[in-house]
Amino acid sequence: CLTEPGAGSEVGAVATKCFPTDTPGLYKIKGQKCFITSGDHDLASNIIHLVLAKTPDAKPGTAGINCLIVPKFWVNEDGSQDAWNDVTSTGIEHKMGIHGSSTLSLSFGENDNCYGWMIGDGPVEGRGKGMSQMFQMMNEERLNTGTFALGCIGSAYYAALDYTKIRKQSPKFTDPKGPSVRIIEHEDVRRMLMFQKAILEASRALLYSTYYY
């Protein structure tokens, strides 16, 4: 959870706070986040958030950011679900597309009872490691997004290819009085298929190269 009402591209402006408690590594969380992808849904019984926040003595800008694990519900040692962790959905974004994924605003600690675990050793003299930790995760997710996109492109191409082999429509351009033929035999359909395949193979090459380096 990165974006806030007052901190979008300027990540260093995050206002969400994390306050140390008597338990080492456990911090009280207070703040608002927005545009959070799959921030809340019914597909899982619990949601574990990675939250960017600053301690009261944090360095200004991105240097003072920390990354914390904040569950929607606490989990017992035996894996069973425990008490609610004061993480509240405060609004759903209405989008032009991507309706299969909920994008919403979240409030942490609205009832002053939200806690999270610091990832790593925590801040030293107000300097946190949250940005490097978050980008390590995000860089891997960017590759995963490319893999997902490649799968979608491939599925669309091969579905279209199969359809062109069974659908008959109109005679060939070179034989206007002849019988209807499979649409894969029409030059413009073949052109569109080749263009789609070129995008598919170029995307595959880009993804493989990115993974390699």
Task: Label each residue range with its predicted role.
Residues 1, 30-36, 46, 86-92, ...:
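Glycine- and acidic
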Residues 6-9, 40-42, 59, 95-102:
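Short Gly/Pro-enriched turn/cap motifs at secondary-structure boundaries
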Residues 74-90, 95, 105-141, 161-184:
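A glycine-rich, basic-preceded beta-loop-alpha segment at the flavin cofactor/substrate interface
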Residues 1-11, 66, 77, 86-87, ...:
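Glycine/proline-enriched, intrinsically flexible loops and inter-domain linkers
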Residues 1, 15-19, 26-30, 35, ...:
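Structured core elements
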Residues 1-27, 32-35, 186-213:
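Gly/Pro-rich turn-and-neighbor structural signature
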Residues 139-213:
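Extended amphipathic alpha-helical segments enriched in small hydrophobics
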Residues 26, 30-84:
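A short core secondary-structure module
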